[in-house]
């Protein structure tokens, strides 16, 4: 098509060599010592003739001769003009002829907006927690433009004699997550729950904890899949709603966007721990924080340490969250499979006395030096042991060792100074 005019490119005959005949001549010539052969070629007509193209062009001229009115039920919803019809026309070779068709994506693009007000979005199935049990909330089919039906209706109206009017309709649109999908995952009842106290927290820290809990709420971990805290929660940035809190840097608490992330990670870790899930990655805080279970805390950082655990159950796990300004709770829902976890905490060992730390602050006044008092808490190591049983049989045992540093005073040097060493650098303000 050139605009609204079909352009016919004439066909032409070709030539073809009879390969079997040529091969026989070559063999005979070789046996008789003849230096060459004469091969004959035959004329071959094109599979698609100029006449076939002219016939298709005539049909195309009819198709673009006038607009096609569009109706949905009893509603006039618009029309397709000749230029639009021309842009949608396609010529498909079919048994020695050209079959006229309309591009399906083009039909969808042009017609879907015209019937959008009559369509309905599908609703995914979901879960509703009632006490310790889970109920499946049924999904619902939606409706959308019937593209195949619209193709046939518009093409028929455009190429056949009579009224140039096409009736278009809708077809069912299934949800991405159906009721059957939801039931098949085996998410039926609570299998673990864990709550941590916020401890002393600013309003920003509480906000961040609640925000991360909302990002995690409703996460489904299918059997054999691994949960990654950083992948699910994503980067902690102001653009995603996070506020400035605090993070541990060396022996100091410093301002940082997303402070409170470790509260969330610690609560999740303890759920995975109590359910006996394999923990693929976990890191303790550099300090011991008393409002977390000793040896069972978890710290994460975007682009750095992560918390990862694997669902080794026979069914999927649904994570649900609840919180107040003083507590955070995660609950895991699945199907119970006779699992029991027995844990014990070893003694504190390898005690370390606090020593001064030396930090460099590029934002401090030139030549400055100041000391920030630490808590003077001792450092130590501790190991938590875990045994996982299923139906009374031991299936796994593992341990988690934490190394907590001693927290001494911090001497902070500004530019133009000569510290004895630099243990860490404060972020520029």
Regions found by a protein language model. Give the residues of each.
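Well-ordered beta-sheet/strand-loop patches within structured domains
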Residues: 24-429
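N-terminal targeting peptides and non-cytosolic leader segments immediately upstream
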Residues: 2-6
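RNA-contacting regions in translation and RNA-metabolism proteins
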Residues: 12-13, 244
